[in-house]
Amino acid sequence: MSVEERPVIFDDQSELPKVFVGGRKSKLALVQTQHVAAMLKKVHPDYSFPVLGLTTLGDQVQSKPLYSFDGKALWTKELETLLLEKVPGFDQQDIIVHSLKDMPTVLPDGCELGAILTREDPRDALVMAAGSPYKTLADLPAGSVVGTSSIRRSAQLKKSYPGLVYESVRGNVGTRLSKLDDPETPYKCLILAAAGLKRLDLGDRITGYLQKPDMLHAVGQGALGLEIRQGDEKTKKILEAIYDKESTLCCLAERAVMRTLEGGCSVPIGVETKYENGKLTLDAIVVSVEGTEFVECTQVRAVEENWEAEQLGKDVAEQLVKDGAKKILDAIHLENIK
């Protein structure tokens, strides 16, 4: 890592004690990181929260679909280095802000998940090209091209809409929308996370929402996860004021499903959670890449503690394996090795 990466830095230069908050350099990531810093400043006015925006491997390599990457730390490794080490030219970070769906379920030694914040809309959004007469995927003519780099999305949609064509589209949200609206575009629509569009004030581009039975969202989608150094009790205490219990229980259950199944960006695992009256409902699905095979499981349980949410996720994953998910996942792993 070198200073030539030209990070983005926001620092009020105050004399207050500093708690350094880092995140990715993309527009959406910076919006999210600055949002977290503002939340923290509101509840801890006696501290300063400088923001760092850094380019990660996932930002640098735009020519490959996400599922072709074997690594599970595609968006996090460089930032975790700054959390754990003193790197020349950089301030050591105290908090790293992640879109939780991009955060590996097994963190590097020395790191821990310090807090999960109130979740934004976790659903996937359908975005039609500007001026399109179509309102739903069912409206599209056979052979229409749907843009998504998520194997989870394409696998589930192939199950419900086998007559459509699914092609990768990379880039930040603005770049993807520009590709969609280009008169020469091959895409009829895109599938994007609703939360990201809303955080960028692009909610008006949402044509509709995808949900059961057509689509279960990604693990942790719509939530922000804050990574800290393991054992950093001071920072953990600072984060207590912005932690959200309901979002935490839901997301921990979802992450336990993926951790138990050993999944990452290259595995089509979808989830949906709901927490009401002390009961957590967890629905999870594993789908083959072509959408021809799938296994789904739903369980409901009284949950109050984090460990109970994680146990629910583990139990759902184990039931999926018993029902045939391992066969689907093994086939995907073998295909990725080829």
Curated annotation (Swiss-Prot):
Cofactor: binding details: Binds 1 dipyrromethane group covalently.
InterPro entries: HemC, Porphobilin_deaminase_cofac_BS, Porphobilin_deaminase_N, Porphobilinogen_deaminase_C, Porphobilinogen_deaminase_C_sf
Keywords: Heme biosynthesis, Porphyrin biosynthesis, Transferase
One MF term in the entry's GO annotations: hydroxymethylbilane synthase activity
Gene Ontology biological process terms in this record: heme biosynthetic process; protoporphyrinogen IX biosynthetic process
EC number: 2.5.1.61
Modified residue annotations for S-(dipyrrolylmethanemethyl)cysteine: C265
Cofactor(s) in the UniProt record: dipyrromethane
Reaction catalyzed: 4 porphobilinogen + H2O = hydroxymethylbilane + 4 NH4(+)
UniProt entry tagged with the keyword Zinc-finger: no
GO CC list: cytoplasm
Pathway: Porphyrin-containing compound metabolism; protoporphyrin-IX biosynthesis; coproporphyrinogen-III from 5-aminolevulinate: step 2/4
Top EC class, one word: transferase
SUPFAM superfamilies: Periplasmic binding protein-like II, Porphobilinogen deaminase (hydroxymethylbilane synthase), C-terminal domain
Lineage top rank: taxon: Eukaryota
PANTHER family xref list: PORPHOBILINOGEN DEAMINASE
Other known facts: The porphobilinogen subunits are added to the dipyrromethan group.
Similarity annotation: Belongs to the HMBS family.
Record's function text: Tetrapolymerization of the monopyrrole PBG into the hydroxymethylbilane pre-uroporphyrinogen in several discrete steps.
Name the record gives this protein: Porphobilinogen deaminase
